[in-house]
Amino acid sequence: KKQYKRLLLQPFLEEFNKFGEVKTYWINGEHLYSYKQTWEKGDGVFESQEAIDPELLKKCHETAKKLLNDLSKDHEKLIQCRVDFACCIDNTNVCRDYFINEIEICPTIPEQESRGHGYVPLAQAVLKACV
């Protein structure tokens, strides 16, 4: 850790795994898809956005949209971004107080997350930004 001054090591938080992380994927400020992720024996377990509580998903989308709008005021518009939400640090009760856990500027797009539909919109957005 001492040698790498710009390395962020994120500890595994069991609370995040208990309630799952809601990950929202955006291209050019527009929501493309979301999913919920937990971990089991080192492997990611994914739930599609249809399986996420609609009210929770709506709140996450609204918060992420505000964040992306604020970021674009101070920096260039992000072509791709993933805004992750988590719940309940040091709290084992069921709650819905999700918060922004992570902002990934250039996230990966595994097939199981995007159901195979993430690459075409991303490629189109990149090409449009380059023209």
Q: PLM ranges: what are they?
A:
Residues C81-V83:
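Catalytic phosphate/metal-binding cores of nucleic-acid and nucleotide-processing enzymes, i.e., regions
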Residues H75-L78, C87-V131:
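C-terminal active-site "lid" helix and adjoining low-complexity regulatory extension at the edge
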